[in-house]
């Protein structure tokens, strides 16, 4: 029996137990720097402590002991200690060349222990743990360049191939891709997993575990859970689930949502609650038991385990509770198409519905250099912001998908596609919808697919170059997790008749479904929309044949969809917009009734079929439906008549008549302060110049505009982000809008300062020694840079001495310390002590998942005379600095000191009221 079937058999009959935290257990051994280094890495520069994966090589006894204790506790699946065993993560420790060996050794040690505990009744499985790395493929690290990337899909894919190859050789039964915060990272890892399995001739189940960044349920890169599942839907993964970020109560609603729609086994391994003020986890196996019982008793999961703060004692308790309980019943695969950007687009199965039905998907056509002269000009001029405005307007006008095409002889289509798609990823109003990647060059399509975390549509593949190329392209579509448009072309040429259209569609369908293994729901046929009313009789039936072919495809090829480039139909009437849109409206009215559910159209220009005058409608229908010979001549006369009226109206306008101006958006009628705040919240920069000019006439100094309405807007954004009402890509876009506003104000500030520096201040940022997590710090850097602060980013694992030295050298105004793991809290105290010893009294801002205001009050503030501020989330740093550096800075410092004194007093009072565990047991209520 293969690995997949073995695990499937177990999941079908019982709830499997996954192990708990590795880092929590390693800390119990009180290992030294020398333990982590061993003799082998004694001379490697930098700190090694905290690199848990290197212990596979230097202290295999410790790692084996932890595996053993989880197996003794009853774990069915143990995770290899390989979370960071890839070059990207190990580069922080100068050990990238040892990453594969760490993966292999971590898996081998787990395999040895699992085999010792396995029995026929209770087989034990080893999961090769693949962590998310501290880099993201979907977001830019550069404030001024939203298209920039710290890492590419290909780089991540290559590193994960090496890691997974080591895991497979080490003997894992499962690949576990966990703590996923960026779906594009996850897709590269899934790609690597299946690539290496194929290379080694094995089939292993792939588990995927998501982490969300807020209670709204979005990933750090902005996707909803539903959009994430759509992105994964083309892959044959074994299970999906969630880990980290939350305790069980916070995670449960998301697991319920996932279980209702995900056609996979469901896993959950929550933290031992949420970190307390000191960064520790207060939950015990006993206190977690009723929380986990809800997952088990309600049939929400197939696999349950623990993440941060959990231990073998937790796992033993979960194993007892799960004994004999029924697992989650896997949901049926959806019978409708899933596409996604940041949000889910669900395309219902074919229903013969009217043209205005939501089942029809408008594909925006204007981001196509071949079809829009304006878009081509903007791309040629590198006017990307204006080009993005075209995409944004299409979505606002009703496009549910945006088509992007960069095929022009004078463009580097691949580079422009990558650049534009990366820029779209930074625009939530556009990125929320799926992208249709449109090119005649296959390398352009694959490059585009590697930029999108959502489930895209490839436009297109065909049998034009033969079956071998068709199959290869289709396999790439599957590999990168997309749907595809299939053109009705084959080796003979383009299908122009009904018979040829259905012949090619049927052949392509069976190759894709039966040979390639593509989900029929992910196939969109384009039976070729061709120009009618050309004066050539053989063209007269093109629209009718398309509509007939649409009905045949949706009837005989189950699940398949139909699309078309609608504007091709009216090509004979280019220059007469009214006639063209009327033809499109009539065509879509009939084609959709027969099952056409996608159309590449100008969504804004869609004409209402029912509002076309009867005498015009009769003529147009005669042409579209080929109801009588010579009808196109009547249409030509109608077109000429309409053009004549349009020309007359144009001439009248030129003679003095003016068209009414479009009504201003409602928010533009508000006060200048509210307009600026709204612009920041929404990331709208179009009106900044006019609004700032007005504000400069109202406020005495340019800096007052920043300190007033602009900072008020940023504070609102921070609050919305903290409440889960905004997500990270929106916050980053807001920060860029703030930067644009500051750049407008900058010359005024410089003039007022008579040439002095116009920067708001200089801030040194660092992830502290022993911690390699830098995504939060990078977000802080982006937001602060956009708020006109000079940011000096020292990177990760920065020793206290270096932070102090740089703060002095750079003449910094503040220091920002970041850390994700519990040991970082102690290191932050050490940094504050070193700054105190150096005579510095600069403000210190601390942030990260384990930090808290209470920890600052109890541990950091008492050892440092300067102000120390706990920053709840990345969007708030700029506002805090503005307060610290402003005229009321001294009052703010005094307020902080009073607040910390109150917190310390409250904490000590609570501790005085708490008895020991033994005292509590002795004083328990005895009811019997």
For each feature predicted by the language model, list its residue ranges.
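Domain-level signal for soluble alpha/beta catalytic cores
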Residues: 1-928
């Amino acid at each position: 029996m293969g690995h997949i079937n073995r695990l499937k058999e177990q999941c079908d009959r019982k709830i499997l137990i996954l192990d708990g935290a590795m880092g929590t257990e390693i800390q119990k051994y009180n290992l030294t720097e020398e333990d982590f280094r061993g003799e082998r890495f004694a001379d490697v520069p930098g700190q090694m402590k905290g690199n848990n994966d290197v212990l596979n090589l230097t202290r295999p006894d410790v790692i084996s002991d932890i595996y053993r204790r989880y197996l003794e506790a009853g774990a069915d699946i143990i995770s290899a200690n390989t979370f960071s065993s890839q070059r990207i993560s190990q580069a922080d420790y100068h050990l990238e060349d040892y990453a594969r060996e760490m993966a292999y050794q971590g898996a081998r040690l787990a395999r040895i222990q699992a085999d010792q505990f396995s029995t026929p009744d209770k087989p034990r499985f080893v999961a090769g743990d693949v962590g998310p790395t501290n880099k993201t493929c979907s977001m830019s690290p550069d404030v001024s360049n939203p298209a920039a990337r710290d890492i590419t899909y290909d780089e991540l894919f290559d590193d994960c191939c090496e890691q997974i190859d080591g895991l497979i050789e080490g003997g894992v039964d499962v690949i576990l891709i966990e703590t996923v915060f960026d779906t594009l990272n996850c897709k590269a890892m899934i790609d690597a997993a299946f690539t290496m399995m194929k290379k080694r001739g094995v089939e292993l189940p792939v588990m995927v575990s998501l982490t969300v960044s807020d209670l709204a349920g979005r990933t750090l890169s902005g996707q909803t859970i539903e959009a994430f599942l759509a992105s994964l839907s083309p892959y044959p993964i074994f299970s999906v689930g969630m880990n980290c970020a939350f305790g069980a109560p916070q995670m449960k609603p998301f697991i319920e949502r996932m279980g209702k729609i995900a056609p996979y086994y469901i896993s959950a391994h929550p933290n031992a609650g949420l970190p307390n003020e000191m960064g520790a986890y207060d939950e015990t196996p006993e206190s977690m038991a009723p929380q986990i019982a809800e997952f088990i008793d309600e049939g929400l999961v197939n696999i349950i385990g623990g993440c941060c703060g959990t231990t073998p004692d937790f796992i033993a308790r979960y194993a007892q509770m799960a004994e004999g309980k029924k697992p989650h019943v896997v949901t049926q695969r959806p019978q409708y198409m899933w596409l996604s950007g940041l949000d889910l687009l669900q395309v219902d199965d074919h229903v013969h519905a009217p043209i205005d039905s939501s089942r029809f998907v408008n594909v925006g056509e204007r981001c196509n250099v071949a079809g829009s002269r304006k878009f081509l000009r903007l791309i040629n001029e590198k006017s990307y912001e204006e080009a993005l405005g075209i995409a944004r307007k299409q979505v606002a006008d009703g496009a549910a998908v945006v088509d992007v095409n960069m095929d022009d002889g004078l463009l580097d289509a691949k580079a422009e596609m990558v650049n534009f798609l990366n820029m779209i990823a930074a625009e939530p109003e556009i990125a929320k919808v799926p992208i249709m990647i449109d090119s005649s060059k296959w390398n352009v399509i694959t490059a585009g697919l590697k930029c999108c975390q959502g489930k895209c549509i490839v436009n297109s593949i065909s049998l034009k170059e033969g079956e071998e190329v068709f199959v290869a392209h289709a396999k790439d579509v599957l590999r990168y997790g997309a749907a595809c448009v299939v053109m009705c072309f084959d080796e003979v040429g383009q299908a122009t008749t009904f018979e040829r259209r259905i012949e090619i569609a049927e052949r392509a369908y069976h190759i894709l479904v039966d040979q390639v293994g593509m989900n029929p729901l992910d196939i969109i046929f384009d039976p070729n929309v061709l120009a009618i009313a050309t004066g050539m009789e053989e063209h007269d039936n093109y629209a009718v044949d398309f509509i007939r072919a649409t009905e045949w495809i949706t009837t005989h090829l189950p699940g398949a969809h139909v699309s078309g480039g609608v504007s091709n139909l009216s090509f004979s009437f280019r220059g007469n917009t009214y006639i063209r849109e009327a033809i499109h409206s009539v065509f879509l009215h009939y084609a959709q009734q027969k099952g056409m559910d996608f159309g590449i159209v100008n969504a804004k220009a869609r004409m209402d079929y029912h509002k076309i005058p009867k005498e015009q409608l009769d003529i147009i229908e005669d042409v579209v439906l080929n109801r009588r010979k010579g009808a196109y001549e009547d249409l030509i006369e109608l077109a000429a008549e309409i053009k004549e009226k349009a020309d007359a109206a144009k001439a009248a306008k030129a003679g003095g008549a003016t068209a009414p101006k479009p009504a201003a958006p409602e928010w533009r009628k508000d006060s200048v302060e509210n307009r600026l705040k709204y612009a920041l919240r929404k990331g709208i920069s179009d009106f900044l110049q006019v609004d700032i000019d007005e504000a400069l006439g109202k406020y005495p100094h340019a800096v007052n505009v920043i300190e007033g309405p602009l900072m008020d807007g940023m504070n609102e954004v921070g609050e919305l982000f903290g409440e889960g009402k905004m997500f990270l890509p929106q916050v980053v876009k807001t920060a860029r809008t703030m930067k644009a506003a500051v750049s407008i104000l900058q010359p005024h500030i410089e003039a007022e300062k008579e040439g002095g520096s116009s920067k708001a201040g200089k801030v040194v940022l660092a992830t502290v020694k022993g911690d390699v997590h830098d995504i939060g710090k990078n977000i802080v850097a982006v937001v602060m840079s956009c708020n006109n602060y000079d940011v000096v980013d020292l990177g990760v694992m920065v020793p206290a001495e270096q932070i102090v030295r740089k703060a002095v050298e750079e003449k910094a105004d503040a220091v920002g310390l970041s850390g994700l793991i519990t040991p970082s809290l102690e290191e932050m105290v050490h940094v504050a002590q070193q700054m105190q010893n150096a005579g510095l009294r600069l403000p210190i801002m601390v942030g990260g998942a384990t930090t808290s205001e209470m920890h600052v009050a109890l541990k950091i503030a008492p050892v440092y005379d300067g102000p120390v501020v706990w920053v709840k989330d990345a969007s708030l740093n700029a506002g805090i600095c503005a307060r610290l550096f402003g005229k009321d800075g001294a009052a703010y410092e005094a307020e902080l000191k009073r607040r910390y004194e109150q917190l310390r007093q409250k904490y000590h009072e609570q501790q005085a009221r708490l008895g020991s565990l033994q005292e509590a047991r002795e004083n328990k209520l005895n009811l019997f």
